[in-house]
């Protein structure tokens, strides 16, 4: 009887420890974005399908720009550039280094933008539409 009670208490203690681990484990982190890249996500709040654009690709494209998926709804800036974004005629653009037509905001390096200012707009990285 004493042995059964000891085993029962040990089992309860194990359950409490495992339960505590479950409750104290950190929440799942947002999808990662490789260093030196701009990542777009199809959902708001950095969720959904991810597209990775290396900063080197954006620089190589120059003023032609790199088109991102029309489904882009949020992005993480893992580059060393400050990103500016905003409506520019019919598109939302990100320009390196920081030239933007009708800029409405900017994202510092390493920052995460939970949702784009105009969902559904095409995002072009590196396209220079002038000031």
UniProtKB/Swiss-Prot annotation:
Listed InterPro entries: Antimic/Inh_G_crystallin-like, G_crystallin-like
Keyword Protease: no
Signal peptide: 1-29
SUPFAM superfamilies: gamma-Crystallin-like
Keywords: Disulfide bond, Metalloenzyme inhibitor, Metalloprotease inhibitor, Protease inhibitor, Signal
Cysteine-cysteine disulfides: 33-39, 93-98
GO molecular function, one term: peptidase inhibitor activity
Additional comment: Thermolysin slowly cleaves only the peptide bond following Cys-93.
Role summary: Inhibits microbial metallo-proteinases, such as thermolysin, but not serine, thiol, or carboxyl proteinases.
Protein name: Metalloproteinase inhibitor
Organism in which the protein naturally occurs: Streptomyces nigrescens
Gene behind this protein: smpI
